[in-house]
């Protein structure tokens, strides 16, 4: 399934989506920003089910998605969010 994600991070030089759907790979899913102060966006591929993810800002700070529920079981010890993907 393709899932769009949007993140506001004004002043950030880079934002990457990391999560169990990409094995927390810090290079697999760089986001694009539209305009100098626009939101960062990406569409990720994730199988149906529950996924845990976060945004990696400027290569050093993990931030949970403020638009999604927080994860309770943090396998990686980071603040993270939950993404539920349902089959069509």
Placement of each model-derived feature along the sequence:
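Aromatic-rich carbohydrate-binding modules that target alpha-glucans
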Residues: 2-50, 59-86
